[in-house]
Amino acid sequence: MTLTEETLRFIREHRKDNVRNLALQAHKYPTVDVPAAIIQIVGRQIAEEKIPAWAAREGILYPTHLSMEQCSSEVTANYKVKIVSDTGYGSRKTFTDLTGGFGIDCAFLSACFQQSAYVERQETLCTIAAHNFSLLNLKQVMVCHEDSIRYLQMMEPVDWIFIDPARRDGHGGKTIAISECEPDVSALENLLLEKASHVLVKLSPMLDLTLALHDLKHVQAAHVVSVNNECKELLLVLERGKELVPEEIPIHCINLTASQKVQKLLFIRQQEKEHTCPYTPTLKTYLYEPNASILKAGAFRSVSSIYNVEKLHPNSHLYTSDEYIPDFPGRKFRITDSSSLNKKELKKLIGTEKKANLTVRNFPASVAELRKRLKLAEGGDIYLFATTLADEKKLLIACKQP
């Protein structure tokens, strides 16, 4: 990818501008490759939020919008580094990223190794990666323009392989199984572990975690990773020569927050089955909502047991306690009032409020429907939870942050 000095100057001068307006004004800049410039401007604008360290580096090249949307963030890439850096996982000399993409994960992970290989079948992405790795002085990374499966078959053994299969349903259908992704890691598992003692698999949070743990035979740990309470990635560590039944696999529920605090919960499915979880139709002083990673992983009884909180209903996934628990891995609220769906009670609950933050958990109406009925805009200091209690009573719970 070659950009003229004039196009590069245009990118620098307009990097914070609205790209739609720039596209409409393209005729004003006959000596500038405006379409190419817009790709770079959009890429950098996304990177400012997603990969700030790269956005701050002058000269980084960016791929198309789709590749930028699909790539890992700086925060999740750093978390992968922590996984691979675990001293219990043995040697870290050689590494191969079989699905290179924009190269974020490869760039961050390669810092842990003496030699690394970036493999990507799209030539444009290889060109971008080679430029950026050189700019970032990542001399230990070799860029390979090749199909991942073909490269895997012919490569020399390494210590670690990273692979990020893409969901391949082109019709908007819901992809939930590893076998529906490309490449199919379940079909390649034996070959992957012939070539590496450890494999780190990144999966979409849309996939079924339980199904993935059954489909792969050598999973040693699963990491469900959220950023600011939005589930972003499922990460599976495969280890050669070791097998665990799915019920014994450690599952790390991680929420990386804007305040740099990390919410963690570790559980295994066997313990989850054995834990008791008390249900209550009575609201206590505080309301607790587990973070997105815990909800995705299904650690509902474990949360109750570890933090000594009672659940409102088997399907509501909200908990209550008279004790304030500052390190609870999720959102924490002080309950101020509650109401049935009776008009008088609702009027008393809402009062003169014009807006509130509304959440629905196990309730026969959507957020949009309730917002319209209650005539409330989004925002403000009030948090409303529409849910069902253990006695099947439908309730609106008003809360504030403690």
Where are the language model's segments positioned?
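SAM-dependent transferase fold signal centered on methyltransferase-like domains
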Residues: 1-402
